[in-house]
């Protein structure tokens, strides 16, 4: 089981990164919250991972801390929720926000997430309510040194047409339809916004 990677980021293309550890490049898919907590390509990063082995592939999913990874693991226990949908959910809201939705039976909010229909939202509430009853939001002992490496210290650059395209591509990869993704980006775009801000604002506007 690969549970943690520390190395140099070679590439960043939302929602995936390529990180080199001891000469080996690992492709890792992350929720947007974790993706944009990473530094720029060429810098060192630490990623907590969940390793999935399938008949046709071996996949790594990455997270900023153990808390977010723990929520991902709870999500994929739900019938009908796979890793891709779990990433989309954690991209649309934080783990703590999701817990509040479950506790409040907020089906109308959950169905606004990509790939989550009414039946899936209801199933999430039914299957997870008891399991998340004592969810504290604790960081599950993520070492402080790891957090420091994971913190994003880069300066945001001004948004361009490429930033818009990248943001739309990221939303589509999360499960949003291209037309809806483009519309959401156009609605929130303000001159000077970078790709990260575009994605964050568009996701928030669709909830």
UniProtKB/Swiss-Prot annotation:
InterPro entries from the UniProt entry: DNA_helicase_Holl-junc_RuvA_I, Hlx-hairpin-Hlx_DNA-bd_motif, NA-bd_OB-fold, RuvA, RuvA_2-like, RuvA_C, RuvA_C_sf
Encoding gene per record: ruvA
Chain residue ranges for the region called Domain I: 1-64
Database matches in HAMAP family: DNA_HJ_migration_RuvA
Assembly information from the UniProt record: Homotetramer. Forms an RuvA(8)-RuvB(12)-Holliday junction (HJ) complex. HJ DNA is sandwiched between 2 RuvA tetramers; dsDNA enters through RuvA and exits via RuvB. An RuvB hexamer assembles on each DNA strand where it exits the tetramer. Each RuvB hexamer is contacted by two RuvA subunits (via domain III) on 2 adjacent RuvB subunits; this complex drives branch migration. In the full resolvosome a probable DNA-RuvA(4)-RuvB(12)-RuvC(2) complex forms which resolves the HJ.
Keywords: Cytoplasm, DNA damage, DNA recombination, DNA repair, DNA-binding
One GO molecular-function entry: four-way junction DNA binding
Region (Flexible linker): 144-158
Protein name, entry field: Holliday junction branch migration complex subunit RuvA
Location in or out of the cell: Cytoplasm
Region (Domain II): 65-143
GO biological process, one term: DNA recombination
Native organism: Psychromonas ingrahamii (strain DSM 17664 / CCUG 51855 / 37)
Similarity comment: family membership: Belongs to the RuvA family.
Keyword field contains Cytoplasm: yes
Domains as described in the record: Has three domains with a flexible linker between the domains II and III and assumes an 'L' shape. Domain III is highly mobile and contacts RuvB.
